[in-house]
From Swiss-Prot:
Biological role stated in the UniProt entry: Single strand-specific metallo-endoribonuclease involved in late-stage 70S ribosome quality control and in maturation of the 3' terminus of the 16S rRNA.
Stored HAMAP family: Endoribonucl_YbeY
Protein name from the UniProt record: Endoribonuclease YbeY
Gene it is expressed from: ybeY
Record localization: Cytoplasm
InterPro entries recorded: MetalPrtase_cat_dom_sf_prd, YbeY, YbeY_CS
UniProt record similarity statement: Belongs to the endoribonuclease YbeY family.
Main location: cytoplasm
Keyword Hydrolase annotated: yes
Gene Ontology MF terms in the entry: metalloendopeptidase activity; RNA endonuclease activity; zinc ion binding
Needed co-factor(s): Zn(2+)
Length: 162
């Protein structure tokens, strides 16, 4: 079971909470244990501040992942961590990349959840594994390959907004 805390700190239109839950559950289904996860949906000011504080990059990015570092057995439900998603960046990227907004949202939520599970894309081999899993999961939802186009930025690497 997934315990999802969806925190909305944006006035912009958003996918339904059921969509966020479906995307998270799909990404986390390899976990047999119950999980707790927070997704905070923010505007550019908060997104920029968090990215500056935690990654030392002075611009808002699409998704930030904060894996929990809680000793095992301390909580009834294992806390996976937090995702912070910058709503205007997601909207802008989807438009610039000619992607359906729901497909891009699904991709970024899945991408962030995989980071919370320990996946990364720093090394090429890790990136290939993570991207392959993202493609497979998104295909199950009926969405196209999010990496179909080498000129597109990876999640978490969005440069300063245009």
């Amino acid at each position: 079971m997934l315990e999802l805390d969806l925190q909305v700190a944006s006035v912009r239109p958003l996918p339904a909470e059921d969509d966020f839950r479906r995307w998270c559950e799909l990404a986390l289904r390899q976990r047999s244990a119950d999980s707790e996860l927070t997704i905070r949906l923010v505007d550019e000011e908060e997104g920029r501040e968090l990215n500056r504080t935690w990654r030392h990059k002075d611009y808002p990015t699409n998704v930030l992942s904060f894996p929990a570092e809680v000793p095992e057995g301390l909580l009834d439900i294992p806390l996976l961590g937090d995702l912070v998603i910058c709503v205007p960046v997601v909207e802008r990227e989807a438009a610039e990349q000619d992607k359906a907004a729901d497909a891009h949202w699904a991709h970024l939520v899945i991408h962030g959840c995989l980071h919370l599970l320990g996946y990364d894309h720093i090394e090429d081999a890790e990136a290939e594994e993570m991207e392959s899993l993202e493609r497979d999961l998104l295909a199950e939802l009926g969405y196209p390959d999010p990496y179909d186009g080498d000129d597109l930025p990876e999640p978490g690497t969005m440069s300063e907004g245009r």
